[in-house]
Amino acid sequence: MGELRSTTPTHSNVLNLALTFSLSAGETSLLDKGLLFIPTPSKVDKQALRRDLHAYHRRLKLLERFGYRSDTTREPFTLPSNWEPEEEAISEPLRELIGEDVEALNNLPRCRFPQNNLTNEERQALINLKNNKGIVIKPADKGSKIVIQDRSGYLLEAYRQLENKKHYLPLEKPIQSETQEKVREILDNLHTRKYITFKQLTYLYGDDPPRRRKFYLLPKIHKDPSSWTVPHRIPPGRPIVSDCGSESYQVAEYLDSFLNPLSQKHPSYVKDTYTFVNLLKQVKLTPGSFIFSVDVDALYTQINTHLGLQAVRNIFDQYPDPSRPDEELLKLLELGLTCNDFEFNSKFYLQVHGTAMGKKWAGAYANIYLAEWERTVFPKCPKLPTVYLRYLDDIFGVWPHSKTDFADFMVILNNHHEAISLKSDLQPESVNFLDTEVFIREKDGVLGLGTRVYFKPTDTHALLHKSSYHPRHTYKGIIKSQLIRFRRICEAEADVQSATRTLFQALKPRGYSRTFLRGINKEVKESFARGFAPAIREDRNQNLIPLITTFTPSSVSLNSSIKTNFGRLQESVEQLQDFRVIAAFRKNKNLKDVLVQASLPAHRPKRDPLAPYFKTLRYITNPHTNLSSPVWGDYSLDSKNLIYGIQCKVCLMWYIGQTKNPLKQRLKQHLYCIRHPHRNRILYDHFQAHGHENLQISGLEKGTNWSLRKRLWKERMWIKKLNCLFPSGLNEAL
């Protein structure tokens, strides 16, 4: 008999809008833990742990090599270097430490994971939800709810937006290759004119081939359900275009480094909530004043490209900088705006109006555009607010005039640019802005503004579940940061306590005990009573040596051994006295990583017949020589211009090769030569004897603009590093 399924469409942290799917008890229980919940992992990735240890040892080698200087910084927009001193070049104490650490890793006891934090039903529910291609799971656009939609409903809203010819046009095929050529031509010019170095050019070239951009939606369930695309069934979606790995991804980072500082120079700029609260403390009101909030509707998709580029040009002119390549930056920005093609449901589109959320520079670009809009619209207004503050597309102000005057003010603003539409809320007592409620209050006979915490109606306060597989200090840190936020926003103790009660009531069902919560609350309250308001600490890690591993019982045990070994090294190396090892943990996969994807999953994904031959490596070892090396970067069968390794699964021997072409193409050539013997080569003879099905290929290192000479040199280095020459490997003498 199947598991009982709930007919209730909603749960405290889950909104199920799917008509064809109902949540089982196990699925409801699983999702209610939140998308940040991490299930207890079932195994330790020893390869990754070995690579992490190597990275730590590399830091120690470099520290010794450069005279224990802690002030070294990497040039911006460059790939991290993998270079490290040879073993022969390091001191004997450090060599001994490395040996002790490696021995500690090799002798790690088999650490048992704590009790599984999911029931058998929840584990099966995770598998079922992951494999269900008929539904789409997304986090809500605002708040912390998880939204489940029918695939058909999600597609309906997506195509409603994509069929708007004003914003998007269909394409027969992607144009990324053509765009990549244009981007690289501009980058080559920047390098020729010495605005960027060769290392920066290599970084900004990006991945080859570039990853296709993906379009997806975040459901706006905070909107009035009666106004949804299909009322109460299909909410409107916020369009996002994932830019990761595209031909302009690194270029967007470079552009943002120039645009972001300029975007903060307008008079209405608000950095964050705390800046906003501090600004309001200085405001004095006249009797009869109103306060208002204004929201710019769908700002990103409504920005006129010509006006947006002109706004950027204007701010470049306003703040000239001879070291800034203005014309090239504008060309790169224009390409990012006009060549923003993407894929959705195996179809291709081009965005022709506005910009996509997902670009690194999108926020700064929108900020500059609105700053220019403000500069040109305010002279048209006969009456202006006495206070006008803006955080991106959210505006707060004080209006000392009549309601009629405010209505006239809004008409002027709404008619200034055709595409810019504003929604306003004018109130005599209080308005909501960001995560604050701003209210008019009298203090010492003076009218001013106070603030308290504002919780959106869709906010379920679904902070990290206490049983999630995280380090213990994480839970306390999350709660503490919220309580600090309450005290920095709220003016009155009663408001702090009200917000705290709301949060704690939501956290108790999520595994947090009353004693645990009260203890943190007491600690924060006492720190503020002493006049110490905890703030974000400045970077103080100049004498810290990071040891970064994925959180598991094995990594915790290894960290302890490594710190002990480092303590002994400090006794013999005086220069290390001011340094200490700090352990930082990388998270395991959470529910969002498993269940939420940018791409819409295909009903029947095509299986690449070459996929069984490919394996992702984090660490490579030649067992016939005991030589090893970490593998950095991510690779696939589409990766090109790279060094690769082929291992025989029978005898574990390695072959190192290089190719300019996609790895898939090189693999096909190797398989053809194995199946059709016509050369007397060690590699092909070996797999003719052991079977091509025992061949496994992996990417080891790649470079976007490597020449043949560079690839051949890298190939020799890898062969030497692992000693893969026959008979220790399958490479022939060069």
How should each PLM-predicted stretch be described?
Residues M1-L734:
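Charged structural interfaces that engage phosphate-rich ligands
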